Every structure is written in structure tokens, then in C-alpha cells.
């Protein structure tokens, strides 16, 4: 298992959930919810987090349909990841995130949280689930999870 803090990202249309791992890449924990902006302010905030925590890699959830096909949300997450890799200068990987938000909602309901007041927390919980899944997959296979994001060159 590679060492270093990793960041988990759940890209939504309104909010971005952020989670982080411990230095050994064992445990993911919720970190912050960043408001999604039409400009680069959201990516700049994530870049600040990367610097503050000394992040070595970012895991972005790739929202696929249950059948595995790409959706509008998939395209949005890929575009965000491609812009993020340019902004932060740290490696970014896309990892399948099917059902992470559903799992986060379920876990929060089980803990007694109501849906409306826990929306920002749901995003962090989904990011935590995405990151923990990636950490567990790497530990099981000894390979980095998902696939790397390359910066987009040109239009």
C-alpha cells in the first residue's frame, strides 16, 4: 500500500463532498463540503485543501448508471476531474462510485439524521465511501484503483 494522504471527491451539481485518508491510506473520514461554483472557485478551494493536507492523490467518484453506461453526471465528473488535475498538480484518478450517495443516505437515515438538514453531510459521506472503497481496492490488489486522469490539452 502506498503511503500519503489521499482526498476523496464526490462531484455534485450543487455541492462537492470531500473526504481524506490517514497518512497510511487505511481509513477515510469526512472532511468538508465545498459549494459548486460556475467558475474555478470550487477547484481553488480543493487545491487549498490539497496543499494544507499534503495530499498525494485525489480520487474522484465516477457516477455511472447501474448498467455501467455513462450519463450526464459521468461527463460532468470527468470534466471536473480533468480541470482539477490542471488546477492542483496532484495525480487524480476516477473510480466507479455507483450507489455511493444511496449508501450515504441510508447510513445517515440509520443514524437518525433527517434528509433535508443532512444534505451537506451526505456529500461528505458519499466522498468518504468513494475514498474508502478505493483504499480497500488498492489494499486488496496492490494496484492503484480506477484510472488516471490526464490533463486535457486544447478545446
UniProtKB/Swiss-Prot annotation:
Broadest EC class assigned to this enzyme: hydrolase
Predominant location category: cytoplasm
Subcellular location: Cytoplasm
Keywords tagged on the record: Cytoplasm, Hydrolase, Nuclease, Ribosome biogenesis
Domain of life: Bacteria
Any one cellular-component term (Gene Ontology): cytosol
Enzyme Commission code(s) on record: 3.1.-.-
Listed GO MF terms: nuclease activity
Span list, region Disordered: 136-155
A family per Pfam: RuvX
One GO term (biological process): rRNA 5'-end processing
Assigned protein family: Belongs to the YqgF nuclease family.
Job description of the protein: Could be a nuclease involved in processing of the 5'-end of pre-16S rRNA.
Name the record gives this protein: Putative pre-16S rRNA nuclease
Species in which this protein is naturally found: Leifsonia xyli subsp. xyli (strain CTCB07)
